UniProtKB/Swiss-Prot annotation:
Designated name of the protein: Tryptophan 2,3-dioxygenase
TM helices/strands, residue ranges: none
Chain residues that bind substrate: F80, I81, I82, Q83, H84, Y142, R146, T283
Source organism per UniProt: Burkholderia cenocepacia (strain HI2424)
GO MF terms held by the record: heme binding; metal ion binding; tryptophan 2,3-dioxygenase activity
EC number: 1.13.11.11
Amino acid sequence: MQPPGGDAPAGCPFSGARAAQPAQAPHEAPHVPGEADAQAGWHNAQLDFSKSMSYGDYLSLNSILDAQHPLSPDHNEMLFIIQHQTSELWMKLALFELRGALDAVRTDALPPAFKMLARVSRILEQLVQAWNVLSTMTPSEYSAMRPYLGQSSGFQSYQYRQLEFLLGNKNAQMLQPHAHRPDILEQVRATLEAPSFYDEVVRLLARRGFPIAAERLERDWTQPTRHDETVEAAWLEVYRHPQQHWELYEMAEELVDLEDAFRQWRFRHVTTVERIIGFKQGTGGTSGAPYLRKMLDVVLFPELWHVRTTL
């Protein structure tokens, strides 16, 4: 969406808009491309990038588009690779936005945090839709390339693991798949040991005057989020009097939106796996679909869901 009065530049590759064309007078002959266009540039567009940055330069497209290296002769492996690479790019943005929102919450700058959280929810919706593309792969097609995957698995995604940790689903055992990469292990461990986004929101509740239990405000951050009665009591007050606590009310709903989108992503993951490989063991050694179904029961922000029953 463009800001009011700020039309996208003609032909901008990011806007998807086509350059506006002046209407031809009835007596004018149709334009025929020729030498004059080659000299002036097509509709005044810059065509020579020998001394300036191009679209491909800015986006490092050579590196991105040369990063697909299928190991099998099977045609469908390219789909499998690009599906996961693009998912990793979206997760990179989700982590970037979540960390920005976390910093904003720490300084009580909630409106910017709302914007970032809404963006994370939209990113998760994009990831949900991506499963529709991968699900065009049939069991026969996947079986042809699966032997070439070895033990590699999405279970080992260090960005996904950081996303889980940042949202409060902590598990120190999940550090082990990254032990062979000390640089990555350090990143994942730092996220495990730091307060989650929801932990910072609970601290926000305390700063706004709600009586949150001291043991909830300072705890072992490597442990997953557990239901706390004092936190639910705070959210109950927020939901009963939203006009008095509007920012906290909006924060609560942004978090519910986010977890709702995350649950949908998990569900589509399960159904896509069941559709393609059934109930075979995953390449990373997990039970596959049964493991993923168990993950559907994980609740990231328990008080925000339970308070709906209490209201």
